[in-house]
Amino acid sequence: MNTVRETIAAIATAQGRGGVGIVRLSGPLASQAGQAITGRTLTPRHAHYGPFRDADGLVLDEGIALFFPGPNSFTGEDVLELQGHGGPVVMDMLLQRCLQLGCRLARPGEFSERAFLNDKLDLAQAEAIADLIEASSTQAARNALRSLQGAFSKRVHGLTEALIALRIYVEAAIDFPEEEIDFLADGHVLRMLDDVRSELSTVQREAGQGALLRDGMTVVIAGRPNAGKSSLLNQLAGREAAIVTDIAGTTRDVLREHIHIDGMPLHVVDTAGLRDTDDHVEKIGVERALKAIGEADRVLLVVDSTAPEASDPFALWPEFLDQRPDVAKVTLIRNKADLSGEHVGMEQSDDGHVTITLSAREDDMGLDLLRDHLKACMGYEQTAESSFSARRRHLEALRQASAHLEHGRAQLTLAGAGELLAEDLRQAQQALGEITGAFSSDDLLGRIFSSFCIGK
């Protein structure tokens, strides 16, 4: 049920100059505003070309007006779109005209929020709009579109329906003890529960892949000066993103580059060489490098394989281990194999540490090994056509639902406690409901929609 009565307006197209710009309105004043601006009564879902006029009848622009009466519109309310020339001054004049007619400026994401509140789409679909706009690769855009079309929501709804059926069976047995249903002897509850757990595990895995394509991972390149860190960044980026010289300390600040490997986004950070220095600026760069190391998903510790001290790379900089105690997330890169004559390849020690020997000067000397290794570190798989976009909050909700099902199963098998199982099933259903918005606090909704673009 729609309780929003204000009419909102915003420029729906990106800032800057363009061939076409769109001002969008939603609310009860949309039809009246369209008539005032165009001077005619707009036929629903028809394109009307003509002048857009101000309050004095002067022409502001010429373009197309489209009116979509609710509830058959994106927001579920009356919607007006004014498509004119995409100059910022023209768009601003047209927007100001709408505000003069009683509209107010829309908040970021408010159009999508109204669509959600009016049951035109659920929360996961609304978030997919933002993900589609922000997609940084073809596969990420395809996944976001599938989520917008309801692929993710359908999977969640399927899990929810299965949980509801299971809850009905369990709670009926609790409420009618005279039926004397033995949960364990019956076996029906455990079979249903395990089926839900299996499907939930599949959705978790697919959602994890979707989140990878959306968020990617942060990879920090660290090491001594002149180890070849910037050359490695340039090879991964496929361009001269960093300055490369023989002068130690050329890189004095963190340099960030956004790249893709088979569609997976990587945020690669090149850092200042790790060494003791009296240079104030370089010292700041080293401090920032250590900070980046501590925040990374994966660290590539680059060593010059021709240097005498390369035999014990972790001893080169003791503070490195202080910043990154989980050495399992550090990959040792023995660089300059073209000079040292070392065999190009990848080795994994008994304790799980990975060493890759390569040359950052030559793309065919170990770079493909590194790319495959980075994909494997994040558990990346070539995305199937059925995949969808997901966010970290979705993964957390799925994790919580899984934890409740695991706990409920343990309560049933160890103690035969049907009442405790029923409560865990309820909480699992609520966790899934947070994904689609069936159970979401106002604070959560506010945070989600405030991250959208204005006009969306």
Swiss-Prot record:
The gene is mnmE. Exhibits a very high intrinsic GTPase hydrolysis rate. Involved in the addition of a carboxymethylaminomethyl (cmnm) group at the wobble position (U34) of certain tRNAs, forming tRNA-cmnm(5)s(2)U34. Signal peptide: none annotated. Its cofactor is K(+). It is an enzyme of class 3 (hydrolase). SUPFAM superfamilies: P-loop containing nucleoside triphosphate hydrolases, TrmE connector domain. This is tRNA modification GTPase MnmE. It comes from Pseudomonas entomophila (strain L48). K(+) binds at N226, T245, I247, T250. Homodimer. Heterotetramer of two MnmE and two MnmG subunits. (6S)-5-formyl-5,6,7,8-tetrahydrofolate binds at R24, E81, K120, K456. The keyword Magnesium applies. The lineage of its organism: Bacteria, Pseudomonadati, Pseudomonadota, Gammaproteobacteria, Pseudomonadales. The keyword Hydrolase applies. Its EC number is 3.6.-.-. Binds 1 potassium ion per subunit. Keywords: Cytoplasm, GTP-binding, Hydrolase, Magnesium, Metal-binding, Nucleotide-binding, Potassium, tRNA processing.
